[in-house]
Amino acid sequence: MEKLKIMVVFGTRPEAIKMAPLVLELQKQKEVIETITVVTAQHRQMLDQVLETFNIVPDYDLDIMGKSQTLLDITSKILNQLDPVIKKEKPDMVLVHGDTTTTFAASLVAFYNQVRIGHVEAGLRTFDKYSPYPEEMNRQMTDDLADLYFAPTGESKANILKENHPESSIVVTGNTAIDALKLTVQEDYHHEVLDQLDPAKKVILVTMHRRENQGQPMRAVFGALREMVDQEPTIEVVYPVHLSPAVQEAANDLLGDHDRIHLIEPLDVLDFHNLASRSYFIMSDSGGVQEEAPSLGKPVLVLRDTTERPEGVKAGTLKLVGTDPAVVKSTMTELLSNESLYLQMANARNPYGDGKASERIVQAIKHYFGQGEVAEEFHEGEKE
C-alpha cells in the first residue's frame, strides 16, 4: 500500500499549539503516512517557542513575517511561497487549522493545485463578518474550500451542515487544544513569576490581543482592571503581554508600575498552561483559552462582544463580558465574591474535548482515503 502524504500548514502560536498534537500523532503512523510540516511563521518568535516545546522541526519554513505587514501582504506572501512547495511535494491532503490568514491562504493554494483540504476546528461561527476580524471570514471561506471537516463539537458540525456540506465529510473530533494540555501540564512545574506572587492572594491571568479590541476597547478594559486591583487587595494580575506594539503600548501605559500587576514576556505553551492551572480565574479574548480553561477547572471571563464558542457559554464555563469597563468590573466583583457562582463555573463540564481529537482526525483521514475504519466521534459531556 502506498503511503499517504499529508501536509500540515500553520503559522501562528495558537495554530501551532493545536496542530502540534496532530503532527505528533501523524508521525506515529510513519508506516502508512508521510507527514510534511510547513510553517509560514506568521508569528515568528511565539511560533518558535511552541515548536521547541513539542520538539517539532518543520520541513519547510516560509518565514513570511515582516514589520508592519498588512493582511494583504501576509496573504500574497503565503500564496506565492507555498505554491512551489505544494507543487514539489504533491501531497494527498493539506491540513489547515482554524481561522488565521495562513489558514485561508494555504487552503486557496491547495485548491488551486487540486489538492484535498482537511480543516481542523471547522464550523466555528459568530455570523458577524467583522467580529472577529478577519477570522470569521477566513474560516467561512476555508470551509467553502475544504473536503474533510474536523468539527470540534456537535454545534460546529450543525453549522457546517447548514451551509450544505455533506454529512459524510464531517467528523466531530473534540478540540486538539485539550490534547495539547495533556502533554504540557505538570504537577511539579515552576516559573520565576510564581516567586513574585503572594500565595495568599487570588491570581487572575489575563490575555488580550485581538485586532478588533486594540485601541479604545483594550484601554477601557485595562483601566477597569487597574481600578479593580486597587480596590481588591486580595488579587494579583499576571499578564503575558502580546508582542504587538499597540498592545505593548496600552499595557505599559495603563497597567505598568503596579506592585500587584505583573506584565511579563509572552509565555511558551508549557508556561502558559501551567500558570493557567495555578490561577483563580482567567480573563481573555483568546479563542484557545476558552477551550483550554474548562479542562483546568478555571472560569473564563471573555473580553469580547461575540464568541464562536457558544458551547462554553451554555455549559457555564465561560461568561461573555465584552469590553465595557463597568461590566468588566461588576463581573469580576461577582466572581470574586460569590463562591457558589465560582464553583459552578469551575466545575462545569468541558464541552470541547477529551484529549483524543488527534487520534480521531488521523483515523478519519485514513478512512477518507480507504485505509481504515470510520473514526469514532467525540460526544460532548463525556469524561476526559
Model-based region annotation:
Residues 1-239, 244-384:
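Nucleotide-activated sugar donor-binding and catalytic core shared by glycosyltransferases
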